[in-house]
């Protein structure tokens, strides 16, 4: 019952309050900077010193999030040295739920926590997972809702293209 109530509340918050912010985060818009609690201190979005930040909003009850984490691990490993930083923002109300998820689906990238959901509202998140690719200045390069392995090639291509553009004179 508690879980169903939490899901219903999150749905209302995500759809009701997030809609206006979604319009502000179209491609080319500057995303609001975030400073969130992480396991080893504060986590900044966009990530400090990163050429690109992949921001992923997730929750422990999100089925597609379980599929996206291994892919994000791959992207961090493959492109981290080139300047990509993956930041996954957990929106669970209970920290223990996120901890259980992370025991089952490990993350080799930064995890930030926002039980209030304020960051999701500011980024116009309407469902999970929702991912946003930001350049070093916080400009939105890509916004993607959901995750399926079939999405992976196009998402990776967007990361490659953005990194190549950053390197070009």
Kindly label every feature range from the protein language model.
Residues 8-18:
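Bacterial N-terminal signal peptides
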Residues 49, 100-108, 115-160:
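Thiol/disulfide oxidoreductase modules built on the thioredoxin-like
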């Amino acid at each position: 019952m508690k879980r169903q109530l939490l899901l219903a509340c999150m749905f209302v918050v995500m759809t009701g309050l997030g809609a206006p912010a979604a319009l502000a985060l179209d491609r080319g818009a500057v995303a609001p900077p975030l400073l969130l609690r992480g396991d080893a201190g504060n986590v900044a979005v966009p990530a400090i010193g990163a050429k690109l930040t992949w921001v992923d909003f997730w929750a422990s009850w999100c089925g597609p999030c379980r599929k996206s984490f291994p892919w994000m691990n791959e992207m961090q490993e493959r492109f981290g040295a080139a300047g990509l930083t993956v930041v996954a923002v957990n929106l669970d109300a209970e920290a223990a739920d996120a901890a259980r998820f992370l025991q089952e689906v490990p993350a080799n990238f930064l995890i930030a926590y926002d039980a209030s959901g304020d960051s999701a509202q500011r980024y116009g998140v309407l469902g999970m997972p929702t991912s946003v690719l930001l350049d070093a200045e916080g400009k939105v390069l890509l916004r993607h809702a959901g995750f399926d392995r079939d999405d992976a090639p196009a998402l990776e291509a967007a990361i490659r293209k953005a990194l190549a553009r950053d390197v070009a004179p």
